[in-house]
């Protein structure tokens, strides 16, 4: 949300899951996300999850796609890389620092023996790592945000035929 406040733009939360994930999505709306999209299927594997998110993003392009570390692939980080490949976008994984300057992103990540600083043009997919948001910057929704979140859109999309067939296998 700090990135949104610093550079403008819109934040949309996208997840693949059933109705049980909606309270977490509403919390993201309460702390400042503009919209949320839930793709209505149980995420059974990384490929079908990445396919669904990519299909949505093909119809609704984004300048910056930030994927969290916690995922159904036991934190393997496969989903953001697959999304980047499916959308033919650059990808940087394990990012713990991000700065947007114009149409470029400056990202940093810890590697064996030090820190790596990279630059990439937007649009871009990054996989987040601890440190991307400082603990002191974490937000707790206030009552006003919670009330506003009730009126913000939470769109429910049905999965594509391809992912439905893959999940059935």
Task: Report the location of each language-model feature.
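N-terminal glycine-rich FAD/FM-binding segment characteristic of electron-transfer flavoproteins
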Residues: 1-169
């Amino acid at each position: 949300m700090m990135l949104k406040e610093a550079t403008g733009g819109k934040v949309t939360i996208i997840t693949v899951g059933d109705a049980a994930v909606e309270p977490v999505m509403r919390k993201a709306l309460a702390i400042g996300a503009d919209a949320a999209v839930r793709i209505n299927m149980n995420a059974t594997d990384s490929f079908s999850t990445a396919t669904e998110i990519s299909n949505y993003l093909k119809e609704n392009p984004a300048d910056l796609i930030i994927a969290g570390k916690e995922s159904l692939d036991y934190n393997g980080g496969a989903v953001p890389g697959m999304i980047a490949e499916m959308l033919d976008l650059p990808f940087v994984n394990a990012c713990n620092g991000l700065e947007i300057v114009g149409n470029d992103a400056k990202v940093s990540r810890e590697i064996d023996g030090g820190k790596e600083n990279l630059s990439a043009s937007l649009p871009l997919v990054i996989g987040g790592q601890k440190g991307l948001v400082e603990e002191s910057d974490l937000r707790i929704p206030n009552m006003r945000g919670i009330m506003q979140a009730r009126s913000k859109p939470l769109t429910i999309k049905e999965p594509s035929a391809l992912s439905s067939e893959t999940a059935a296998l």
